[in-house]
Protein backbone atom coordinates (compact mmCIF):
# COMPACT_ATOMS: atom_id res chain seq x y z
CA UNK A 1 0.00 0.00 0.00
CA UNK A 2 1.12 3.60 -0.53
CA UNK A 3 2.78 5.49 2.32
CA UNK A 4 1.00 8.66 3.40
CA UNK A 5 3.06 11.83 3.77
CA UNK A 6 1.80 14.06 6.58
CA UNK A 7 2.25 17.82 6.30
CA UNK A 8 1.43 20.64 8.70
CA UNK A 9 -2.18 21.95 8.51
CA UNK A 10 -2.60 24.28 5.54
CA UNK A 11 0.82 23.35 4.17
CA UNK A 12 -0.06 20.25 2.12
CA UNK A 13 2.30 20.17 -0.88
CA UNK A 14 0.81 19.66 -4.36
CA UNK A 15 -2.63 18.67 -3.12
CA UNK A 16 -3.82 17.62 -6.60
CA UNK A 17 -0.64 15.88 -7.74
CA UNK A 18 -1.18 12.27 -8.77
CA UNK A 19 1.39 9.51 -8.56
CA UNK A 20 1.65 7.90 -12.00
CA UNK A 21 1.36 4.12 -11.93
CA UNK A 22 0.40 1.72 -14.69
CA UNK A 23 -0.89 -1.79 -15.17
CA UNK A 24 1.03 -4.07 -17.52
CA UNK A 25 -0.25 -7.26 -19.09
CA UNK A 26 2.98 -9.06 -20.02
CA UNK A 27 1.47 -11.58 -22.39
CA UNK A 28 2.79 -14.55 -24.31
CA UNK A 29 1.64 -13.23 -27.69
CA UNK A 30 0.94 -9.55 -27.03
CA UNK A 31 1.59 -7.13 -24.17
CA UNK A 32 -0.25 -3.97 -23.13
CA UNK A 33 0.09 -1.07 -20.73
CA UNK A 34 -2.86 0.82 -19.23
CA UNK A 35 -3.41 3.68 -16.81
CA UNK A 36 -6.29 5.38 -15.02
CA UNK A 37 -7.08 8.84 -16.38
CA UNK A 38 -9.89 10.90 -14.90
CA UNK A 39 -11.00 7.83 -12.93
CA UNK A 40 -11.35 5.78 -16.14
CA UNK A 41 -8.88 3.00 -17.00
CA UNK A 42 -7.63 3.06 -20.58
CA UNK A 43 -5.05 1.21 -22.61
CA UNK A 44 -2.17 3.39 -23.79
CA UNK A 45 -1.38 3.13 -27.50
CA UNK A 46 1.86 3.71 -29.40
CA UNK A 47 2.50 6.63 -31.74
CA UNK A 48 0.15 5.02 -34.28
CA UNK A 49 -2.55 4.40 -31.69
CA UNK A 50 -1.99 0.64 -31.58
CA UNK A 51 -2.81 -0.83 -28.17
CA UNK A 52 -1.14 -4.22 -28.56
CA UNK A 53 2.62 -4.65 -28.53
CA UNK A 54 3.59 -8.04 -29.99
CA UNK A 55 5.76 -9.82 -27.40
CA UNK A 56 8.53 -10.29 -29.95
CA UNK A 57 12.19 -9.21 -29.73
CA UNK A 58 14.74 -9.48 -32.55
CA UNK A 59 18.46 -9.24 -31.78
CA UNK A 60 20.78 -7.77 -34.43
CA UNK A 61 24.54 -8.31 -34.94
CA UNK A 62 25.30 -4.73 -33.80
CA UNK A 63 23.56 -5.62 -30.47
CA UNK A 64 20.59 -3.35 -31.15
CA UNK A 65 17.06 -4.72 -30.92
CA UNK A 66 13.78 -4.48 -32.77
CA UNK A 67 10.72 -4.90 -30.56
CA UNK A 68 7.05 -5.42 -31.32
CA UNK A 69 5.53 -5.16 -34.79
CA UNK A 70 8.84 -4.63 -36.59
CA UNK A 71 10.36 -7.70 -34.94
CA UNK A 72 7.23 -9.68 -35.73
CA UNK A 73 7.48 -8.76 -39.41
CA UNK A 74 11.15 -9.81 -39.48
CA UNK A 75 10.60 -13.12 -37.68
CA UNK A 76 10.10 -15.10 -40.88
CA UNK A 77 13.49 -14.23 -42.36
CA UNK A 78 15.46 -14.36 -39.09
CA UNK A 79 13.74 -16.91 -36.83
CA UNK A 80 16.79 -17.88 -34.74
CA UNK A 81 17.37 -14.33 -33.51
CA UNK A 82 13.71 -13.33 -33.17
CA UNK A 83 12.33 -14.44 -29.81
CA UNK A 84 8.57 -14.97 -29.62
CA UNK A 85 6.44 -16.35 -26.74
CA UNK A 86 9.32 -15.81 -24.32
CA UNK A 87 6.86 -16.00 -21.43
CA UNK A 88 6.84 -19.77 -21.90
CA UNK A 89 10.54 -19.89 -20.98
CA UNK A 90 10.38 -17.73 -17.84
CA UNK A 91 11.74 -19.62 -14.84
CA UNK A 92 12.23 -22.79 -16.90
CA UNK A 93 15.15 -25.20 -17.17
CA UNK A 94 16.39 -26.80 -20.38
CA UNK A 95 14.47 -30.03 -19.78
CA UNK A 96 11.24 -28.01 -19.50
CA UNK A 97 11.54 -26.58 -23.03
CA UNK A 98 12.98 -29.67 -24.72
CA UNK A 99 9.51 -30.67 -25.99
CA UNK A 100 9.37 -27.59 -28.26
CA UNK A 101 10.44 -29.58 -31.33
CA UNK A 102 9.37 -26.88 -33.80
CA UNK A 103 11.29 -24.16 -31.96
CA UNK A 104 14.01 -22.57 -34.10
CA UNK A 105 16.12 -21.47 -31.12
CA UNK A 106 19.49 -22.70 -29.94
CA UNK A 107 18.88 -23.21 -26.23
CA UNK A 108 21.76 -23.05 -23.77
CA UNK A 109 21.55 -24.85 -20.44
CA UNK A 110 22.51 -22.42 -17.70
CA UNK A 111 22.20 -22.47 -13.91
CA UNK A 112 18.76 -21.26 -12.91
CA UNK A 113 17.07 -20.78 -16.27
CA UNK A 114 17.40 -21.78 -19.90
CA UNK A 115 19.04 -19.19 -22.18
CA UNK A 116 18.90 -18.55 -25.92
CA UNK A 117 21.87 -18.10 -28.24
CA UNK A 118 21.54 -15.08 -30.60
CA UNK A 119 23.86 -13.06 -32.84
CA UNK A 120 23.99 -10.50 -30.03
CA UNK A 121 25.10 -13.10 -27.49
CA UNK A 122 23.34 -15.46 -25.13
CA UNK A 123 20.10 -13.97 -23.78
CA UNK A 124 17.99 -15.08 -20.84
CA UNK A 125 14.16 -14.95 -20.88
CA UNK A 126 14.46 -12.28 -18.18
CA UNK A 127 16.50 -10.05 -20.51
CA UNK A 128 14.09 -10.59 -23.41
CA UNK A 129 11.09 -9.79 -21.21
CA UNK A 130 12.89 -6.71 -19.91
CA UNK A 131 13.12 -5.36 -23.48
CA UNK A 132 9.33 -5.65 -23.83
CA UNK A 133 8.70 -4.07 -20.42
CA UNK A 134 11.10 -1.20 -21.12
CA UNK A 135 9.23 -0.45 -24.37
CA UNK A 136 5.92 -0.37 -22.50
CA UNK A 137 7.41 1.82 -19.77
CA UNK A 138 8.63 4.32 -22.37
CA UNK A 139 5.22 4.28 -24.09
CA UNK A 140 3.52 5.03 -20.76
CA UNK A 141 5.89 7.84 -19.82
CA UNK A 142 5.47 9.42 -23.26
CA UNK A 143 1.67 9.19 -22.99
CA UNK A 144 1.42 10.39 -19.39
CA UNK A 145 4.14 13.02 -19.63
CA UNK A 146 6.10 12.06 -16.52
CA UNK A 147 8.08 9.30 -14.83
CA UNK A 148 6.27 6.32 -13.32
CA UNK A 149 6.31 5.51 -9.62
CA UNK A 150 5.66 1.86 -10.37
CA UNK A 151 3.61 -0.78 -12.12
CA UNK A 152 1.33 -3.69 -11.37
CA UNK A 153 2.35 -6.55 -13.65
CA UNK A 154 0.04 -9.47 -14.30
CA UNK A 155 1.09 -13.13 -14.33
CA UNK A 156 -0.83 -16.39 -14.83
CA UNK A 157 -2.35 -17.64 -11.58
CA UNK A 158 -0.36 -20.85 -11.97
CA UNK A 159 3.06 -19.18 -12.22
CA UNK A 160 5.22 -20.68 -9.48
CA UNK A 161 7.74 -18.79 -7.34
CA UNK A 162 10.55 -19.10 -9.90
CA UNK A 163 8.42 -17.68 -12.71
CA UNK A 164 7.13 -14.84 -10.52
CA UNK A 165 10.63 -13.95 -9.40
CA UNK A 166 11.83 -13.98 -13.01
CA UNK A 167 9.04 -11.54 -13.89
CA UNK A 168 10.06 -9.19 -11.07
CA UNK A 169 13.71 -9.42 -12.15
CA UNK A 170 12.73 -8.48 -15.71
CA UNK A 171 10.79 -5.46 -14.43
CA UNK A 172 13.74 -4.25 -12.37
CA UNK A 173 16.02 -4.69 -15.38
CA UNK A 174 13.56 -2.52 -17.35
CA UNK A 175 13.70 0.20 -14.70
CA UNK A 176 10.24 -0.50 -13.31
CA UNK A 177 9.29 -0.56 -9.64
CA UNK A 178 6.93 -3.49 -9.13
CA UNK A 179 4.04 -2.40 -6.93
CA UNK A 180 2.58 -5.88 -7.11
CA UNK A 181 2.34 -8.99 -9.24
CA UNK A 182 -1.33 -9.68 -9.89
CA UNK A 183 -2.90 -12.89 -11.15
CA UNK A 184 -4.37 -12.32 -14.61
CA UNK A 185 -7.87 -13.67 -13.83
CA UNK A 186 -7.98 -11.54 -10.72
CA UNK A 187 -7.11 -8.47 -12.78
CA UNK A 188 -10.01 -9.29 -15.08
CA UNK A 189 -12.30 -9.58 -12.06
CA UNK A 190 -11.28 -6.11 -10.95
CA UNK A 191 -12.16 -4.67 -14.35
CA UNK A 192 -15.50 -6.45 -14.63
CA UNK A 193 -16.48 -6.22 -10.99
CA UNK A 194 -15.97 -2.49 -10.67
CA UNK A 195 -17.30 -1.60 -14.11
CA UNK A 196 -20.55 -3.49 -13.60
CA UNK A 197 -20.87 -3.33 -9.80
CA UNK A 198 -21.68 -7.03 -9.97
CA UNK A 199 -21.97 -9.31 -6.97
CA UNK A 200 -22.08 -13.09 -6.75
CA UNK A 201 -19.97 -16.01 -7.94
CA UNK A 202 -18.13 -15.66 -11.24
CA UNK A 203 -15.78 -17.78 -13.29
CA UNK A 204 -12.88 -16.16 -15.13
CA UNK A 205 -11.88 -18.29 -18.12
CA UNK A 206 -8.51 -17.01 -19.32
CA UNK A 207 -7.03 -18.56 -22.45
CA UNK A 208 -4.01 -16.56 -23.49
CA UNK A 209 -1.27 -17.26 -25.98
CA UNK A 210 0.67 -19.63 -23.77
CA UNK A 211 -1.28 -20.35 -20.60
CA UNK A 212 -4.77 -21.27 -19.47
CA UNK A 213 -6.20 -20.16 -16.13
CA UNK A 214 -9.56 -20.62 -14.50
CA UNK A 215 -10.53 -18.75 -11.34
CA UNK A 216 -13.72 -19.00 -9.33
CA UNK A 217 -14.42 -15.67 -7.65
CA UNK A 218 -16.88 -14.43 -5.10
CA UNK A 219 -17.67 -10.75 -5.60
CA UNK A 220 -19.37 -9.00 -2.69
CA UNK A 221 -19.48 -5.42 -1.47
CA UNK A 222 -15.94 -4.13 -1.48
CA UNK A 223 -14.39 -7.59 -1.46
CA UNK A 224 -12.97 -9.73 -4.27
CA UNK A 225 -12.33 -13.22 -2.92
CA UNK A 226 -10.69 -15.90 -5.04
CA UNK A 227 -12.38 -19.16 -4.02
CA UNK A 228 -10.16 -21.38 -6.15
CA UNK A 229 -7.79 -21.37 -9.09
CA UNK A 230 -6.72 -23.92 -11.65
CA UNK A 231 -5.35 -24.17 -15.12
CA UNK A 232 -2.59 -25.42 -17.36
CA UNK A 233 0.68 -23.52 -17.63
CA UNK A 234 1.42 -25.06 -21.04
CA UNK A 235 -1.87 -24.63 -22.89
CA UNK A 236 -2.85 -21.57 -24.88
CA UNK A 237 -3.60 -20.09 -28.26
CA UNK A 238 -0.10 -21.06 -29.41
CA UNK A 239 -1.11 -24.71 -29.14
CA UNK A 240 -4.04 -24.14 -31.51
CA UNK A 241 -1.59 -22.47 -33.92
CA UNK A 242 0.79 -25.42 -33.52
CA UNK A 243 -1.98 -27.94 -34.24
CA UNK A 244 -3.04 -26.00 -37.32
CA UNK A 245 0.60 -25.83 -38.45
CA UNK A 246 0.84 -29.63 -38.18
CA UNK A 247 -2.36 -29.93 -40.24
CA UNK A 248 -0.92 -27.66 -42.95
CA UNK A 249 2.31 -29.70 -43.06
CA UNK A 250 0.34 -32.96 -43.22
CA UNK A 251 -2.06 -31.74 -45.93
CA UNK A 252 0.71 -30.29 -48.12
CA UNK A 253 3.17 -33.15 -47.50
CA UNK A 254 5.92 -30.75 -46.48
CA UNK A 255 8.79 -32.59 -44.78
CA UNK A 256 11.38 -31.52 -43.80
CA UNK A 257 11.05 -27.75 -43.49
CA UNK A 258 13.60 -25.04 -42.84
CA UNK A 259 13.26 -22.86 -39.75
CA UNK A 260 12.32 -19.94 -42.01
CA UNK A 261 9.56 -21.92 -43.74
CA UNK A 262 8.32 -23.17 -40.38
CA UNK A 263 8.04 -19.61 -39.09
CA UNK A 264 6.28 -18.48 -42.29
CA UNK A 265 3.70 -21.26 -41.99
CA UNK A 266 3.23 -20.49 -38.30
CA UNK A 267 2.39 -16.88 -39.21
CA UNK A 268 -0.08 -18.12 -41.84
CA UNK A 269 -1.62 -20.57 -39.33
CA UNK A 270 -2.16 -17.83 -36.77
CA UNK A 271 -3.71 -15.52 -39.37
CA UNK A 272 -6.05 -18.31 -40.52
CA UNK A 273 -7.15 -19.02 -36.95
CA UNK A 274 -7.95 -15.35 -36.41
CA UNK A 275 -9.82 -15.15 -39.73
CA UNK A 276 -12.13 -17.97 -38.62
CA UNK A 277 -13.26 -15.80 -35.71
CA UNK A 278 -14.95 -13.58 -38.29
CA UNK A 279 -15.99 -16.08 -40.99
CA UNK A 280 -16.60 -19.77 -41.61
CA UNK A 281 -13.70 -20.40 -44.01
CA UNK A 282 -10.36 -18.96 -45.10
CA UNK A 283 -7.58 -19.68 -47.59
CA UNK A 284 -3.98 -20.39 -46.56
CA UNK A 285 -1.40 -19.32 -49.16
CA UNK A 286 2.39 -19.48 -48.83
CA UNK A 287 5.45 -19.70 -51.08
CA UNK A 288 8.32 -21.64 -49.47
CA UNK A 289 12.09 -21.27 -49.93
CA UNK A 290 12.08 -24.39 -52.11
CA UNK A 291 9.57 -22.78 -54.46
CA UNK A 292 6.76 -25.04 -53.27
CA UNK A 293 3.37 -23.37 -53.11
CA UNK A 294 0.93 -24.02 -50.30
CA UNK A 295 -2.72 -23.39 -51.13
CA UNK A 296 -5.28 -24.82 -48.72
CA UNK A 297 -8.86 -24.01 -47.78
CA UNK A 298 -9.57 -24.18 -44.06
CA UNK A 299 -13.16 -24.32 -42.82
CA UNK A 300 -14.33 -23.77 -39.28
CA UNK A 301 -15.53 -27.39 -39.26
CA UNK A 302 -12.03 -28.69 -40.02
CA UNK A 303 -10.45 -26.35 -37.47
CA UNK A 304 -12.94 -27.36 -34.77
CA UNK A 305 -12.28 -31.04 -35.46
CA UNK A 306 -8.48 -30.88 -35.29
CA UNK A 307 -8.48 -28.71 -32.15
CA UNK A 308 -11.41 -30.31 -30.28
CA UNK A 309 -9.05 -32.09 -27.86
CA UNK A 310 -7.48 -28.75 -26.90
CA UNK A 311 -10.89 -27.21 -26.20
CA UNK A 312 -11.82 -30.18 -24.01
CA UNK A 313 -8.44 -30.00 -22.28
CA UNK A 314 -9.42 -26.59 -20.88
CA UNK A 315 -12.59 -27.95 -19.27
CA UNK A 316 -10.86 -30.45 -16.95
CA UNK A 317 -9.28 -27.67 -14.82
CA UNK A 318 -12.65 -25.86 -14.87
CA UNK A 319 -14.38 -28.86 -13.28
CA UNK A 320 -11.59 -29.14 -10.72
CA UNK A 321 -11.75 -25.45 -9.79
CA UNK A 322 -15.52 -25.67 -9.30
CA UNK A 323 -15.09 -28.68 -7.00
CA UNK A 324 -12.43 -26.84 -5.00
CA UNK A 325 -14.73 -23.83 -4.62
CA UNK A 326 -17.67 -26.02 -3.64
CA UNK A 327 -19.95 -24.66 -6.34
CA UNK A 328 -21.76 -26.13 -9.33
CA UNK A 329 -21.88 -24.65 -12.85
CA UNK A 330 -25.46 -23.47 -12.38
CA UNK A 331 -24.43 -21.46 -9.29
CA UNK A 332 -22.07 -19.36 -11.39
CA UNK A 333 -23.77 -16.07 -12.27
CA UNK A 334 -21.47 -15.16 -15.11
CA UNK A 335 -18.40 -16.29 -17.01
CA UNK A 336 -15.78 -13.70 -17.92
CA UNK A 337 -13.65 -14.42 -20.99
CA UNK A 338 -10.06 -13.22 -21.01
CA UNK A 339 -7.33 -13.60 -23.62
CA UNK A 340 -7.38 -13.26 -27.38
CA UNK A 341 -7.78 -17.02 -27.84
CA UNK A 342 -11.30 -16.80 -26.36
CA UNK A 343 -12.41 -15.13 -29.59
CA UNK A 344 -12.47 -18.58 -31.20
CA UNK A 345 -16.14 -19.53 -31.72
CA UNK A 346 -15.46 -23.12 -30.57
CA UNK A 347 -14.19 -21.84 -27.23
CA UNK A 348 -17.18 -19.56 -26.68
CA UNK A 349 -19.59 -22.37 -27.57
CA UNK A 350 -17.85 -24.90 -25.30
CA UNK A 351 -17.81 -22.48 -22.37
CA UNK A 352 -21.44 -21.52 -22.95
CA UNK A 353 -22.54 -25.17 -23.13
CA UNK A 354 -20.60 -26.07 -19.98
CA UNK A 355 -22.03 -23.28 -17.83
CA UNK A 356 -25.44 -23.19 -19.48
CA UNK A 357 -25.19 -19.48 -20.32
CA UNK A 358 -23.40 -17.31 -22.88
CA UNK A 359 -20.12 -15.92 -21.53
CA UNK A 360 -19.67 -12.21 -20.82
CA UNK A 361 -17.86 -10.31 -23.54
CA UNK A 362 -18.54 -6.70 -22.48
CA UNK A 363 -14.85 -5.84 -22.45
CA UNK A 364 -12.21 -6.58 -25.05
CA UNK A 365 -10.66 -9.90 -23.91
CA UNK A 366 -7.24 -8.68 -25.04
CA UNK A 367 -7.47 -5.54 -22.89
CA UNK A 368 -9.42 -6.54 -19.80
CA UNK A 369 -6.39 -7.78 -17.83
CA UNK A 370 -4.39 -4.61 -18.45
CA UNK A 371 -7.38 -2.46 -17.45
CA UNK A 372 -7.79 -4.32 -14.16
CA UNK A 373 -4.06 -4.07 -13.47
CA UNK A 374 -4.21 -0.30 -14.09
CA UNK A 375 -7.01 0.06 -11.55
CA UNK A 376 -5.00 -1.91 -8.98
CA UNK A 377 -1.89 0.19 -9.71
CA UNK A 378 -3.87 3.40 -9.29
CA UNK A 379 -5.11 2.17 -5.93
CA UNK A 380 -1.64 1.11 -4.72
CA UNK A 381 -0.22 4.48 -5.80
CA UNK A 382 -2.66 6.16 -3.43
CA UNK A 383 -4.74 7.91 -6.09
CA UNK A 384 -8.16 6.44 -5.27
CA UNK A 385 -10.95 8.79 -4.33
CA UNK A 386 -13.28 8.35 -1.34
CA UNK A 387 -15.66 5.49 -2.00
CA UNK A 388 -13.27 3.78 -4.41
CA UNK A 389 -11.77 1.52 -1.74
CA UNK A 390 -12.06 -2.20 -2.36
CA UNK A 391 -10.27 -5.23 -1.09
CA UNK A 392 -8.61 -7.92 -3.17
CA UNK A 393 -8.10 -11.38 -1.71
CA UNK A 394 -5.88 -13.64 -3.84
CA UNK A 395 -4.90 -17.26 -3.21
CA UNK A 396 -1.95 -19.65 -3.56
CA UNK A 397 -2.50 -22.62 -5.91
CA UNK A 398 -0.51 -25.34 -4.06
CA UNK A 399 -0.09 -26.16 -0.36
CA UNK A 400 3.17 -25.24 1.36
CA UNK A 401 4.55 -27.47 4.08
CA UNK A 402 7.57 -28.82 5.93
CA UNK A 403 9.03 -32.32 6.17
CA UNK A 404 8.75 -34.00 9.58
CA UNK A 405 10.18 -37.25 10.97
CA UNK A 406 9.43 -40.28 8.87
CA UNK A 407 9.40 -38.32 5.61
CA UNK A 408 5.94 -36.90 6.30
CA UNK A 409 4.61 -33.51 5.20
CA UNK A 410 3.04 -31.14 7.68
CA UNK A 411 1.06 -28.57 5.69
CA UNK A 412 1.62 -25.06 7.06
CA UNK A 413 -0.37 -23.10 4.47
CA UNK A 414 -3.06 -25.09 2.62
CA UNK A 415 -3.72 -24.41 -1.05
CA UNK A 416 -6.31 -21.77 -1.92
CA UNK A 417 -5.34 -19.82 1.21
CA UNK A 418 -5.85 -16.08 0.76
CA UNK A 419 -2.62 -14.10 0.32
CA UNK A 420 -0.76 -12.28 1.70
CA UNK A 421 -0.67 -14.82 4.52
CA UNK A 422 1.56 -15.87 7.40
CA UNK A 423 1.15 -19.10 9.35
CA UNK A 424 3.31 -20.53 12.14
CA UNK A 425 3.57 -23.92 13.77
CA UNK A 426 5.74 -25.25 16.60
CA UNK A 427 7.94 -28.33 16.30
CA UNK A 428 10.34 -30.02 18.71
CA UNK A 429 13.47 -32.17 18.75
CA UNK A 430 13.48 -35.94 18.27
CA UNK A 431 16.63 -36.84 20.20
CA UNK A 432 18.20 -35.84 23.51
CA UNK A 433 20.85 -33.14 23.14
CA UNK A 434 19.80 -32.28 19.58
CA UNK A 435 21.39 -28.90 18.73
CA UNK A 436 20.37 -28.50 15.08
CA UNK A 437 17.30 -29.05 12.94
CA UNK A 438 17.03 -29.41 9.16
CA UNK A 439 14.09 -27.52 7.64
CA UNK A 440 12.85 -28.91 4.32
CA UNK A 441 10.31 -26.64 2.59
CA UNK A 442 7.85 -28.48 0.34
CA UNK A 443 5.09 -27.65 -2.13
CA UNK A 444 2.27 -30.01 -3.07
CA UNK A 445 -0.77 -31.97 -1.95
CA UNK A 446 0.72 -35.39 -1.12
CA UNK A 447 1.29 -36.77 2.39
CA UNK A 448 4.89 -37.92 1.87
CA UNK A 449 7.81 -35.56 1.25
CA UNK A 450 9.13 -37.78 -1.55
CA UNK A 451 5.93 -37.14 -3.53
CA UNK A 452 6.02 -33.34 -3.15
CA UNK A 453 8.17 -30.68 -4.80
CA UNK A 454 11.22 -29.56 -2.83
CA UNK A 455 11.47 -25.75 -2.68
CA UNK A 456 14.34 -25.18 -0.25
CA UNK A 457 16.40 -26.64 2.59
CA UNK A 458 18.10 -24.81 5.42
CA UNK A 459 19.31 -25.53 8.95
CA UNK A 460 18.62 -24.02 12.34
CA UNK A 461 21.75 -24.39 14.50
CA UNK A 462 22.50 -23.36 18.07
CA UNK A 463 19.51 -25.09 19.70
CA UNK A 464 20.33 -25.47 23.43
CA UNK A 465 20.91 -29.15 24.34
CA UNK A 466 17.77 -30.50 26.01
CA UNK A 467 15.94 -33.77 26.38
CA UNK A 468 13.95 -34.81 23.33
CA UNK A 469 10.70 -32.89 23.06
CA UNK A 470 11.73 -29.99 25.31
CA UNK A 471 12.94 -27.53 22.67
CA UNK A 472 10.32 -25.41 20.91
CA UNK A 473 11.07 -24.42 17.30
CA UNK A 474 8.55 -22.04 15.77
CA UNK A 475 8.47 -22.28 11.98
CA UNK A 476 6.77 -19.37 10.20
CA UNK A 477 5.74 -19.41 6.54
CA UNK A 478 4.96 -16.03 4.97
CA UNK A 479 3.67 -15.55 1.43
CA UNK A 480 3.62 -11.96 0.20
CA UNK A 481 1.14 -10.40 -2.21
CA UNK A 482 3.29 -11.51 -5.15
CA UNK A 483 3.12 -15.16 -4.11
CA UNK A 484 6.78 -15.27 -2.99
CA UNK A 485 7.56 -17.35 0.10
CA UNK A 486 9.87 -16.72 3.05
CA UNK A 487 10.37 -19.27 5.83
CA UNK A 488 11.77 -18.53 9.30
CA UNK A 489 12.66 -21.02 12.05
CA UNK A 490 13.20 -19.73 15.61
CA UNK A 491 14.03 -21.59 18.82
CA UNK A 492 11.86 -19.90 21.44
CA UNK A 493 14.12 -20.41 24.48
CA UNK A 494 17.39 -19.10 23.05
CA UNK A 495 16.06 -16.89 20.27
CA UNK A 496 18.37 -18.41 17.63
CA UNK A 497 16.87 -17.93 14.20
CA UNK A 498 17.41 -18.90 10.58
CA UNK A 499 15.45 -18.11 7.45
CA UNK A 500 15.27 -18.55 3.70
CA UNK A 501 13.50 -16.76 0.86
CA UNK A 502 12.31 -19.25 -1.70
CA UNK A 503 13.52 -18.44 -5.20
CA UNK A 504 13.75 -21.89 -6.86
CA UNK A 505 16.46 -22.30 -9.48
CA UNK A 506 13.85 -23.12 -12.08
CA UNK A 507 10.11 -23.56 -12.27
CA UNK A 508 7.84 -26.54 -12.53
CA UNK A 509 7.81 -28.42 -15.79
CA UNK A 510 4.79 -28.02 -18.06
CA UNK A 511 1.62 -29.48 -16.55
CA UNK A 512 3.40 -30.26 -13.26
CA UNK A 513 1.09 -28.16 -11.10
CA UNK A 514 -2.04 -29.69 -12.61
CA UNK A 515 -0.46 -33.14 -12.32
CA UNK A 516 0.42 -32.55 -8.65
CA UNK A 517 -3.16 -31.55 -7.87
CA UNK A 518 -4.61 -34.51 -9.77
CA UNK A 519 -2.24 -36.96 -8.07
CA UNK A 520 -3.11 -35.48 -4.68
CA UNK A 521 -6.77 -36.36 -5.21
CA UNK A 522 -6.19 -39.67 -6.98
CA UNK A 523 -3.70 -40.95 -4.40
CA UNK A 524 -5.46 -39.52 -1.33
CA UNK A 525 -6.50 -42.88 0.13
CA UNK A 526 -3.12 -44.47 -0.54
CA UNK A 527 -1.34 -41.43 0.87
CA UNK A 528 -3.34 -41.51 4.10
CA UNK A 529 -2.42 -45.18 4.58
CA UNK A 530 1.23 -44.35 3.88
CA UNK A 531 1.06 -41.45 6.32
CA UNK A 532 -0.51 -43.62 9.03
CA UNK A 533 2.24 -46.21 8.51
CA UNK A 534 4.99 -43.57 8.65
CA UNK A 535 3.51 -41.97 11.78
CA UNK A 536 3.35 -45.30 13.61
CA UNK A 537 6.94 -46.09 12.60
CA UNK A 538 8.08 -42.71 13.93
CA UNK A 539 6.27 -43.35 17.22
CA UNK A 540 7.78 -46.84 17.37
CA UNK A 541 11.30 -45.45 16.81
CA UNK A 542 10.75 -42.77 19.44
CA UNK A 543 9.51 -45.21 22.09
CA UNK A 544 12.20 -47.81 21.32
CA UNK A 545 14.93 -45.16 21.56
CA UNK A 546 13.53 -43.70 24.80
CA UNK A 547 13.15 -47.16 26.39
CA UNK A 548 16.66 -48.20 25.32
CA UNK A 549 18.12 -45.03 26.89
CA UNK A 550 16.14 -45.71 30.06
CA UNK A 551 17.59 -49.24 30.27
CA UNK A 552 21.09 -47.81 29.90
CA UNK A 553 20.65 -45.30 32.73
CA UNK A 554 18.22 -47.02 35.11
CA UNK A 555 18.31 -50.69 34.13
CA UNK A 556 19.35 -51.61 37.67
CA UNK A 557 15.76 -50.89 38.77
CA UNK A 558 14.65 -54.07 36.97
CA UNK A 559 15.27 -57.69 37.81
CA UNK A 560 16.95 -59.84 35.18
CA UNK A 561 13.60 -61.35 34.16
CA UNK A 562 11.92 -57.92 33.99
CA UNK A 563 14.73 -56.53 31.84
CA UNK A 564 14.58 -59.52 29.52
CA UNK A 565 10.82 -58.99 29.12
CA UNK A 566 11.29 -55.31 28.22
CA UNK A 567 14.07 -56.14 25.75
CA UNK A 568 11.82 -58.77 24.16
CA UNK A 569 9.07 -56.15 23.73
CA UNK A 570 11.61 -53.75 22.15
CA UNK A 571 12.74 -56.45 19.72
CA UNK A 572 9.12 -57.21 18.85
CA UNK A 573 8.37 -53.54 18.08
CA UNK A 574 11.49 -53.25 15.92
CA UNK A 575 10.54 -56.32 13.90
CA UNK A 576 6.87 -55.38 13.46
CA UNK A 577 7.84 -51.78 12.51
CA UNK A 578 9.57 -53.11 9.39
CA UNK A 579 6.22 -54.42 8.14
CA UNK A 580 3.45 -52.60 6.27
CA UNK A 581 0.58 -53.04 8.79
CA UNK A 582 0.24 -49.79 10.72
CA UNK A 583 -2.44 -51.32 12.97
CA UNK A 584 0.02 -54.03 14.05
CA UNK A 585 2.73 -51.44 14.70
CA UNK A 586 0.34 -49.36 16.79
CA UNK A 587 -0.65 -52.43 18.83
CA UNK A 588 3.01 -53.35 19.40
CA UNK A 589 3.82 -49.80 20.53
CA UNK A 590 0.90 -49.82 22.98
CA UNK A 591 2.04 -53.21 24.33
CA UNK A 592 5.57 -51.86 24.90
CA UNK A 593 4.17 -48.74 26.55
CA UNK A 594 2.01 -50.79 28.94
CA UNK A 595 4.85 -53.21 29.57
CA UNK A 596 7.11 -50.41 30.77
CA UNK A 597 4.59 -48.56 32.96
CA UNK A 598 6.03 -50.07 36.18
CA UNK A 599 9.58 -49.31 35.02
CA UNK A 600 8.57 -45.68 34.33
CA UNK A 601 7.03 -45.39 37.82
CA UNK A 602 10.24 -46.66 39.46
CA UNK A 603 12.30 -44.18 37.43
CA UNK A 604 9.99 -41.37 38.53
CA UNK A 605 10.39 -42.39 42.19
CA UNK A 606 14.18 -42.40 41.83
CA UNK A 607 14.10 -38.97 40.16
CA UNK A 608 11.96 -37.49 42.94
CA UNK A 609 14.16 -38.98 45.69
CA UNK A 610 17.25 -37.63 43.95
CA UNK A 611 15.71 -34.16 43.68
CA UNK A 612 14.74 -34.13 47.38
CA UNK A 613 17.96 -35.62 48.72
CA UNK A 614 19.59 -33.41 51.39
CA UNK A 615 16.77 -30.85 51.42
CA UNK A 616 14.89 -29.92 54.61
CA UNK A 617 11.11 -30.01 54.90
CA UNK A 618 11.05 -26.24 55.45
CA UNK A 619 12.76 -25.68 52.09
CA UNK A 620 9.93 -27.51 50.37
CA UNK A 621 7.19 -25.42 51.95
UniProtKB/Swiss-Prot annotation:
GO molecular function: ATP binding; ATP hydrolysis activity; ATP-dependent protein folding chaperone; unfolded protein binding
The keyword Chaperone is assigned to this record: yes
CDD domains in alphabetical order: ASKHA_NBD_HSP70_HscA
Signal sequence extent: none
One of the GO biological process terms: iron-sulfur cluster assembly
PROSITE patterns the record matches: HSP70_1, HSP70_2, HSP70_3
Protein's UniProt keywords contain Repeat: no
Keyword annotations: ATP-binding, Chaperone, Nucleotide-binding
Function: Chaperone involved in the maturation of iron-sulfur cluster-containing proteins. Has a low intrinsic ATPase activity which is markedly stimulated by HscB.
Record-stated family: Belongs to the heat shock protein 70 family.
Name of the protein described by the UniProt record: Chaperone protein HscA homolog
Amino acid sequence: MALLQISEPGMSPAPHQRRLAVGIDLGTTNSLVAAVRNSIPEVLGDERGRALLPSVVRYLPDRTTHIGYRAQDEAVRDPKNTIVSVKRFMGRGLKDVAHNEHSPYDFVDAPGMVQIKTVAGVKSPVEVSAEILATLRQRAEDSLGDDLVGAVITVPAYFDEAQRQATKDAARLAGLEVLRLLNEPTAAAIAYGLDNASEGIYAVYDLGGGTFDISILKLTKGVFEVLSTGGDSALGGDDFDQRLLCWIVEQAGLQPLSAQDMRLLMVRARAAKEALSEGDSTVIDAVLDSGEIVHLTLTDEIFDTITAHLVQKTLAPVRKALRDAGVTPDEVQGVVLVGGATRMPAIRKAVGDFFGQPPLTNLDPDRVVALGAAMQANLLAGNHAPGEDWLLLDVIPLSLGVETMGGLVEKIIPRNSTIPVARAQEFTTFKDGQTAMAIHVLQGERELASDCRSLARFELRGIPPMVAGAARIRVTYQVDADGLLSVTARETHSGVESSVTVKPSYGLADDDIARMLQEGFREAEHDMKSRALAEERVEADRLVEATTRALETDGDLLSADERAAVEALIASVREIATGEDHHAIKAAVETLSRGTDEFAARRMDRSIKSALAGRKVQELG
